[in-house]
Amino acid sequence: MKPTRFYQHRRVLVIGLAKSGAAAARLLAELGAKVVVNDQKPLSENMEAKQLEPLGIRVVCGGHPLELLDEPFDLVVKNPGIPYTNPMVKKALEKGLPVVTEVELAYHISEGSFIGITGSNGKTTTTTLIYEMLKADGQDPLLAGNIGLVACEVAREAKPGQWLVTELSSFQLAGIDKFRPAIAVLLNIFDAHLDYHGTKEAYAAAKANIFRNQTERDYAVVNADDPLVMNIASSVRSQKVLFSATKLLGEGAYVQDGAIYWNGDPVIRIADIVLPGQHNLENILAAVAAAKLAGASDEAIRQVLATFSGVKHRLQYVAEIDGRRFYNDSKATNILATQKALSAFAGEPVILLAGGLDRGNEFDDLLPYLQQVKAVVLFGQTADKIGRIAQKAGIETIRYVDNVEKAVPVAFELSEPGDVILLSPACASWDQYKTFEERGDIFINAVHKLK
């Protein structure tokens, strides 16, 4: 861990615990800050808060009292999940206090260099691919960020010359100040998290923050097929490196003659890549570009792409039961992700399980993709909305159930041998489940109960 006196004796308020907030509080205390943590959950139910008290950290739980900010703080660190509309956060900003996320702390203490990956879809797959490619190359990369590994915890272990391959959400990037990845990857931008950011413009601006502090020595890996991404890329100071699944670029990562090319040279035939789906081709191209910039060999990249079959909850093959194939795509928390999942099974009979948190989206963009679906089983707050679009798409078999667990046997009853039964909700999970991982695990367990 890089020695720093920046936080010594500073008064820091950490708003929101969970994994990232608790990790930030522990780190700040270790760096000599005077830390106060504030969390909505009552202390009696708050194991994370109880574990912080013996470290000399003051704990204020059971709500977000605005008067807490009448005390003199130098800095606020907020859990990424807490929106900027939260009254505590708004008051902190009104008082002129810097408000950051733990990714900023990770950057301050890391002796290694960051590869940051963001986008509306494909972040986890791309992050994992880059990490695996560097590992296969004999490097010693670290995996961090929104992938479930708190960045400021991982950054403590980073050594000079070591890469931190870090998945970054818009929530995290909205709260950075000095954070500067040596390689920044922007995959795509679509309507997502509008309940959090308010507008698509604010959401895109948060994503664009990944490039904000880069210099001419750094790299911006950007999707040449996404107009909004390219618009953002037009103003970056770093060296632009393009990837494209549709354009013959000549430089960067692209497809030509059935193979992936890097700067004019073939790397791997697409036929030799295990990971399914056209959307994953974009993720692979981005990963190839980032891995090559980080020094990976073609052989290491080929080795990974010839064996890597995907990440859990992302078009994950679960089982085949009585001729029906089950896929878990619980990570499909927005409409585009479900469009891509359905595209991956074009021409096959699909029974779709969908629904979840209502963020105000309409689902008309699903209509052309639903026309290939033979039946839908719907749950959650958006069930009626998606059901109306399914009717417009001409789907005759529409079922409504309470939750994912009940959806699985209903889908099985509706299915025939040769069918694909696909969980791809097109919505976040938080109306019924804590995380998309929990939702996916419940789906997997329900599938195995059919055996």
UniProtKB/Swiss-Prot annotation:
It catalyses: UDP-N-acetyl-alpha-D-muramoyl-L-alanine + D-glutamate + ATP = UDP-N-acetyl-alpha-D-muramoyl-L-alanyl-D-glutamate + ADP + phosphate + H(+). ATP binds at residues 119-125. Its EC number is 6.3.2.9. This is UDP-N-acetylmuramoylalanine--D-glutamate ligase. Pfam families: Mur_ligase_C (PF02875), Mur_ligase_M (PF08245), MurD-like_N (PF21799). It comes from the Bacteria. It is found in: Cytoplasm. Cell wall formation. Catalyzes the addition of glutamate to the nucleotide precursor UDP-N-acetylmuramoyl-L-alanine (UMA). InterPro entries: Mur-like_cat_sf, Mur_ligase_C, Mur_ligase_C_dom_sf, Mur_ligase_cen, MurD. Pathway: Cell wall biogenesis; peptidoglycan biosynthesis. GO terms for biological process: cell division; cell wall organization; peptidoglycan biosynthetic process; regulation of cell shape. GO terms for cellular component: cytoplasm. Its main location: cytoplasm. Belongs to the MurCDEF family. Keywords: ATP-binding, Cell cycle, Cell division, Cell shape, Cell wall biogenesis/degradation, Cytoplasm, Ligase, Nucleotide-binding, Peptidoglycan synthesis. The keyword 4Fe-4S does not apply. One of its GO terms (molecular function) is UDP-N-acetylmuramoylalanine-D-glutamate ligase activity.
